[in-house]
């Protein structure tokens, strides 16, 4: 596996590249041009600018997260053709710059949803939290206004001001969009962009819906093993693949993440590893990466990646906010660094076990 770390950019991310360089084993940064609105083309000049910044610290820029999909594409509007052309041109420019994987999602309106960005934990840290009853019983416009106030100055990906400013219009537009419609619009998008991605040497890696169920009446389709299989069959091409986020899919107790890794491993081009703890009422909180701290068996998930000889990209996903760090919700330096060390510790242990079985450590 190739370890990476998500970075929001110079003068934007409070974590400088020189700090990330000090985390053992990190080979690349996961990046994006967050200031460019969805639907606009990324220029070669802007892409090369980030590459140069990363190169100063010997980081690769192989993985982009995300090139956001314009809502008109998800809605299947006639204007989608313009935005798809821009998307294709962005992929061509990224391919020329050596980008290998592009993460994206097809969630209507906004990305991952939580009700509390800084929920106090028993150990004194804070973490992202999802309260089911609150989501089920609040007006989405009011909910998003409350969440924006929690963000402070560090906006979350998928909750950009230009998107939220049109929230009422978007919810109105999605009233008639059911699961089948979203599937059809996704298929159209894939049929258009996957050939371009393949020609550009890029693996497209869709991110699961977070959480993996309908919220506020909006469709969610990348939610489970069966839907992942359906997704991959829409355009059965090696350039059409997955970002497997353990925390997103793992929010649903029916999803067996390790089994999904073993079944679809050859199409998983990007892995997000994090842990969450479920509550009986449908709530969940994010935790440290340690298996015993949450409800997901991170040990077994990492073992599944090791067993399939996973060669692609990994990053620690959302961490807690610890040691009074002032950071973007879920994206602090300290707990994600601890997560990397935990993942590496598990991986190294499985490497030793495998070597022992082969007799390389004198164990017959």
Curated annotation (Swiss-Prot):
Its EC number is 4.2.1.8. Its cofactor is Fe(2+); Mn(2+). One of its GO terms (molecular function) is manganese ion binding. Keywords: Iron, Lyase, Manganese. The keyword 4Fe-4S does not apply. InterPro entries: Man_deHydtase, Xyl_isomerase-like_sf. It catalyses: D-mannonate = 2-dehydro-3-deoxy-D-gluconate + H2O. SUPFAM superfamilies: Xylose isomerase-like. Pathway: Carbohydrate metabolism; pentose and glucuronate interconversion. It is an enzyme of class 4 (lyase). Pfam families: UxuA (PF03786). The keyword Repeat does not apply. GO terms for biological process: D-glucuronate catabolic process. Catalyzes the dehydration of D-mannonate. Belongs to the mannonate dehydratase family. This is Mannonate dehydratase. The lineage of its organism: Bacteria, Pseudomonadati, Elusimicrobiota, Endomicrobiia, Endomicrobiales.
């Amino acid at each position: 596996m190739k370890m990476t770390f998500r970075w929001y950019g110079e003068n934007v991310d409070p974590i400088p590249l020189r700090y990330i360089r000090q985390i053992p084993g990190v080979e690349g940064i996961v990046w994006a041009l967050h200031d460019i609105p969805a639907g606009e083309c990324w220029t070669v000049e802007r892409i090369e600018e980030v590459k140069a910044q990363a190169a100063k610290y010997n980081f690769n820029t192989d993985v982009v997260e995300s090139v956001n999909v314009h809502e008109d594409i998800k809605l299947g509007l006639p204007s989608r053709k313009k935005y798809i052309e821009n998307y294709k041109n962005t992929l061509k420019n990224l391919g020329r710059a050596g980008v290998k994987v592009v993460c994206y999602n097809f969630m209507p309106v906004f990305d991952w949803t939580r009700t509390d960005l800084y929920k106090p934990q028993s150990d004194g840290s804070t973490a992202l939290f999802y309260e089911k009853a609150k989501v089920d019983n609040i007006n989405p416009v009011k909910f998003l206004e409350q969440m924006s106030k929690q963000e402070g100055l560090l906006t979350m990906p998928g909750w950009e001001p230009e998107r939220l400013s049109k929230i009422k219009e978007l919810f109105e537009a999605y009233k008639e969009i059911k699961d089948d419609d979203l599937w059809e619009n996704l298929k159209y998008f894939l049929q258009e962009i996957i050939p371009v991605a393949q020609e550009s040497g890029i693996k497209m890696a869709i991110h699961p819906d977070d959480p993996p169920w309908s919220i506020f009446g909006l469709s969610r389709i990348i939610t489970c093993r069966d839907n992942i299989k359906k997704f991959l069959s829409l355009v059965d091409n090696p350039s059409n693949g997955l970002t497997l986020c353990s925390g997103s899919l793992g929010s649903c107790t029916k999803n067996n993440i390790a089994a999904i890794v073993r079944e679809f491993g050859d199409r998983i081009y990007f892995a997000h590893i994090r842990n969450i703890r479920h509550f009986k009422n449908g709530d969940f909180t994010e935790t440290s990466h340690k298996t015993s701290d949450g409800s997901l068996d991170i040990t077994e998930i990492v073992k599944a990646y090791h067993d399939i000889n996973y060669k692609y990209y990994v990053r620690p996903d959302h961490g807690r906010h610890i040691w009074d760090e002032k950071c973007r919700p879920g994206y602090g330096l300290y707990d994600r660094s601890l997560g990397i060390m935990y993942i590496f510790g598990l991986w190294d242990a499985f490497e030793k076990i495998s070597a022992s079985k082969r007799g390389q450590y004198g164990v017959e």
